[in-house]
A protein has these predicted regions:
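Short helix-capping segments at alpha-helix termini
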Residues: 26-27, 87, 112-116
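Beta-loop-alpha module in the N-terminal Rossmann-like domain of NAD(P)-dependent dehydrogenases
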Residues: 48-110
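Glycine- and other small-residue-rich loops at beta-strand/loop junctions that grip anionic moieties
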Residues: 11, 70, 96, 121-122
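Rossmann-fold dehydrogenase core element
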Residues: 106-123
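Surface-exposed alpha-helical interface segments used for non-catalytic interactions
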Residues: 20, 102-105, 124
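N-terminal Rossmann-like dinucleotide-binding module
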Residues: 1-48
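Short alpha-helical
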Residues: 13, 39-40, 75-79, 99, ...
Length: 125
């Protein structure tokens, strides 16, 4: 069975929930976290026994990462999602996926062109 290696972009409260969820999946492994708040990212990386990346580009450049979870604040999902597509990474994005349809369309287009998957979180559903 393939083990999917995850990275989390964002180090706030929701990132900890995502890290716990990833840890509960048999064929998933959290390998890294990054965030603009480096102290929070370091704390989460220690808590979940994974690498702390300095930024999302460094994380996306890693061949070890298959999927990234975007757990940044609303309105800050498009850029890392498009960058992830450029690096061939699948994306699971916290809701709302973005704040305008135009921004969502750009994300969808980037992933269609890259042949990667883009999905949204629908917890408790």
């Amino acid at each position: 069975m393939k083990i999917w290696n995850f990275g989390i972009i964002g180090a706030g409260l929701i990132a900890d929930f995502h890290a716990k969820a990833i840890g509960s999946i048999n064929n998933a492994r959290l390998v890294g976290i990054c965030g603009t708040n480096h102290e929070k990212a370091l704390t989460l990386s220690k808590k979940h026994n994974c690498r702390k990346y300095d930024n999302h580009i460094e994380m996306l450049q890693s061949d070890e990462i298959d999927i990234v979870t975007i757990a940044t604040p609303s309105g800050a999902h498009m850029e890392p999602a498009i960058e992830a597509a450029k690096y061939g990474k699948h994306v699971i994005c916290e809701k709302p996926i973005e704040i305008t349809l135009e921004r969502i369309d750009k994300m969808i287009k980037a992933h269609q062109e890259a042949g990667t998957s883009l999905g949204g979180i629908f917890n408790f559903r």
